[in-house]
Amino acid sequence: MSGQEVRIGVLANQGDENCMKLWGATAKYLNEKIKDHKFFIVPLGFDEINQSVESGDVDFALVNPSIYVELEMKYDVSRLITLKSQVSGKELIRFGGVIFTSSTNTTINTLEDIKNKSFVAVDAESFGGWQTEWKEFLDHGIDPYKEFAKLDFAGTQEQTVYKVLSGEYDAGATRTGILEQLAQEGKIKLSDIKILNQCTSCNFPFLHSTQIYPEWPIARLSHVDDRLAHEVALAMMEMKPVDEAAKNANIAGWTVPQNYTVIGNTLKTLKIRPFENYGEISIKDIII
C-alpha cells in the first residue's frame, strides 16, 4: 500500500463536524509520522459503518466496541490498538453509560421510576449511549422496549442530553464523560443533572450507571498489509497527551489492544447483532 491514500473510518457519534474536530489532527499526526502514505479521516454514521467496511472503502476503523465485535465476526477485521481517554490527569482505557434525568424531575429517582415514562438514547447501535444502559435495565428486571411509554434515539450524545434537560423526555442515556465534557464547555451545569443508579464502587472518575467496558479500538481491515498496520500501531502508541492529535480528541493516547470478550457477552445478553439468534436452536442444528 506504499504511497496510497489510507482512509480511517471513524464512528461519528457526535456528528460529522465534531468528528473532524476530534480526529482531523490524528490524520495530520500520522501523515507526519508515516510520510509515504496520505491519511484521511472519514466520518461514518451508525448506518454507514458496515457498508464502508464490506466494500473496502476504508482501511482502518475507529468504532465503539459493539460495532467492532460485529465487524470482527462478519468481515474479519482485527483490533490493532485501544484508546486511552483522559480526565483530570488520569488515563483510562474503559468507559460505560450514564442514565440520567433533570434534577428538577421529582418523579424519577430510580430505574424503576422510568417505567411508563419517555426515554431518549443516542442510537440503537451506540454502545455507551444505549446498549450498556439497556443491559443495566434488563439486569434490574426492566424491559425498556416493553415498559417505557416511549423510547426514541436522538442521533448524537449532545442532543440526547439537551432533550432531557429541555423536558422533551423524562430521562435519557449517554456515554460516560459526555456530561462532564458539556459542563466543561459551559453548555450545561452538572447541578441540573440527576444521575440514576449511580455507581461508586469501582475506581472510575466519571459519573456512570453501568458496568465499565474496554474503550474504543482501532481495527485494521483484512486487506491492510502487516507492515502498514505495524507502522500505524507504533506511531499511535507513541502519541503523547500533549500532542495536538491527543488534545483535540481529548484523549491521553493509545495502548495495546484490550480483550473485548465482555462486549460479546453483553451483546449475547441483548440478543443483538451479531448475536441476534444466540441461544436459539435451528432445524439445521437438529439435523446436524
Label every PLM stretch briefly.
Residues 7, 11-12, 81-98, 188-233, ...:
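Periplasmic-binding protein-like
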Residues 3, 7-31, 89-162, 177:
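Bilobed "Venus flytrap"/periplasmic-binding protein-like clamshell domains
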